[in-house]
Amino acid sequence: MKIEQVKIENFRSIYDLTVEFGKVTVLIGKNSSGKTSILNVIRIIFENLDTNSTEKNLNITTITEQNLKDQIRRLWFYTYQNYPIKLAVWLNFDEGEGDKLREVCGLESNVKKAYIEVSIESNNNQIIWKLQNVIIFGYVSETSKIAKEALKKMKEIHSKVTGHNIESKTGDSLVPCVIVESGTIKNKDVFNIFIDLIKNKICYVNTFPEIYKMVNIPIKGLFAHPMVSSELINVIKNTIKDFARLRMLYDCLREIKGSVDTYEQPDRTEILTKSYEGMSLNYELFGSGDQIIDGILASIISKGKHHIFLIEEPEIHLHPAYIRRLARVLEDLANNLNVQLIIVTHSPDFIATLKDKRFVIGVRKDSIKINFEGYPTELLATRIFYPFRGSRLSESLARDLGVVPGYFLFSDVAILVEGNSDRIILQGYIDLLIEQLKNLPKFSYIIIPYAQRSLKEMIKVFKEDYGIKVFLIADNDEEGLKNVKIAKDMGLRENFEVFIIEKKDILGYIKPEDFILALDELLRECLKDKYEEVLQDEEIKSIIDEIKIFGACKNEEGKNEKDLLHKLSGKLFTVLKNVDEEFIITLGWDSGRSIERYLKCKIAEKIVSRLTEVPEDIKKIILNIDSELG
């Protein structure tokens, strides 16, 4: 069994949301964005199903815990209790999983899909969970009597209840069989078989530790207690009793850790012990990461195929290397055991390792316009997007910045600058102003170079897809002015989110003595024994003499600012080709432009630690960004 789709209305921070699921689905985003609410919806639907009734009532007057009382109204979107919470799920069944249903429904092939709809309503002091609709679907021949009768009677009900048209497949029809309609069980026998088929198929893996009460010991912190729940410990105990499951567990652990501390006497499960370098140690004496990995893997292995696992933050207590290996092992287990994993994570490392990222889902809160209790308004609501579908921009950006894919899902602010030298120097200036900044340090911000990419696409991806606040700082040259226009056309406001520095390049602010020192160090490192020969060129010497006086850029009265580093880079390429063409290939320089990009970045890296003051115009830009975030 696999969940294909879940639809949620009016639940917690969710107004109206449809989520598609794959074999391995990963929900990733900031705290309080609604990830766990999506998991809870699945639990609310499935963990309350039973054969006795389609309705469950909770008398809120019986709740004594104040924290639970406080939660009641907040179950509804902005406490909007006049409208019921509506939850629905589409299921796909594995081959052979619904044989009993096929027989009792008279289908010619196995049951393929199911639709379940649940509502939660508030009525005086009652919270009512109600199973509204259950429909199953299977393929039969169009020419068969069953198909004709079913199609005639059920198409109207199907489209009315689900809003979906009946599908076709190679001449066959997907025929619905209504089990529950508007809270009424239509066929008790089929209903019982259906509930027996899907109950206990949803497994919530609790990775969070229980609070264990220790006996009254005068020396605090002396003894260890388990870092996982008693439920996970029992799962481990049951798993290691079975030899095949135990071997599978060990194989997975080797993939993650490289070695295995074996369980001792798996048939003696009162106390879990492991062998460690010839010693017998209790389970709780091993690291918390080891305990969590064992518990997660044992949960999946013990249940096996046809199950769906809901796992929150499997990366808890794990080293980044273990996180990446765990992600790969979980993905392999999902495929090998034919199970579905729905995972909540805060780890970009986890998603970076997945082979199939189509169902990595970014979860965030956005402002939405709705008609709320009779008047139009804007409210924050949980929204989702699929960052690894379509454009691969974020992945290539992550590689260039040396961060893992998914990094941007945790960013609040993106400051777009032209190149890497701008990124490095701007960060240095922000660090110098840190005591004056009230807002920017509170945000997860990232400075991103946009040269060599479509600025329009970058702004769209970060602003619309990721929901990140975007700023642009452009150079004061022809290209910079073009980029300012693009940003303004994309809805960014000049002097609020779009800024232009006074110079043609950020390196133009560097003192000439600091700039020439860094440039000379870099040229000596790169050119080695070719240094003296190259710098004998008269034109190169002339440009360097100007750099000693003016720095990277030269201002001439009545003329445009002259970019001296750009001029030097072009001449260096020409001279180096004449001196030693093979040598220039080894440096990876294929043009004057490539030399310029390299020199800019490396000079910025050398200079940033020597910065002592911030130019006035850049200081004003940074303070304006800080104010805009207030």
Swiss-Prot record:
The UniProt entry, under InterPro entries, shows: AAA_GajA/Old/RecF-like (IPR041685), Bact_Antivir_Def_Nuclease (IPR051396), P-loop_NTPase (IPR027417), TOPRIM_dom (IPR006171), TOPRIM_OLD (IPR034139)
Keywords tagged on the record:
Plasmid
Show where the Toprim domain sits.
412-507
CDD domains in the record, alphabetically? ABC_ATPase, TOPRIM_OLD
Which PROSITE patterns does the UniProt entry name for this protein? Answer: TOPRIM
Return any one Pfam family short name.
AAA_15
PANTHER family per UniProt: ATP/GTP PHOSPHATASE (PTHR43581), ATP_GTP PHOSPHATASE (PTHR43581:SF4)
The name on file for this protein is Uncharacterized protein MJECL35
The organism of origin for this protein:
Methanocaldococcus jannaschii (strain ATCC 43067 / DSM 2661 / JAL-1 / JCM 10045 / NBRC 100440) (Methanococcus jannaschii)
